[in-house]
Amino acid sequence: GHTISNATSTGKKDDNGYATAGIFGWVVSGSVKNLTVDKANFQSTGKGNYSYVGGIAAVAFAASIKNCTVKNSALESKRDYNNNCAGGIAGYSTGATFKNCASVSNNIQSMAYGGSFVGENDDDNDVGNSTYTDCYAVNCSVAAKTEETSGTSFAGGFIGMIVSDIALTNCYAYKQTLSTEGTSASNAATGVFAAY
């Protein structure tokens, strides 16, 4: 496999108002395998429409991610956006396949949906359900905090928010620090595996 160390990204916004930060911004119907990301610093701040931050992919859309690890990294999605996600492996997943992947000792912050592995899983895009096999998250810190009183703050030990059915096989999360402390959101929650 390959290792990428000390990578940085500040989340450039595209013409459609999406800001993404990660080794890959979007992985659409493609695959990433045998990759380790160590000591990355990925951030998305400012104003716009959508903000996604992930250690491997900001957005995994009908993608295959296998044998990948993200460790010792800082992943922050703090844009004043409609949808705001950060996750150790992917910020946002829809119809993606994850196998033999790990999120280890990462610091993850989001204004809305933060997860040690994936920030938000939403499979309502007609590409099938996301699947997770032999994946884990350990020793990560996840914080979800916003100043918007009408907002939502979810911090999950594996996934921040799950919108639709997913398939999980032999996946686990432990030794996580989860927080929504200081949020002004009217709807806030933490969950050992998923916040919502």
Where are these regions (language model features)?
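Predominantly extracellular beta-rich ligand-binding scaffolds that present long acidic/polar faces
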Residues: 1-196
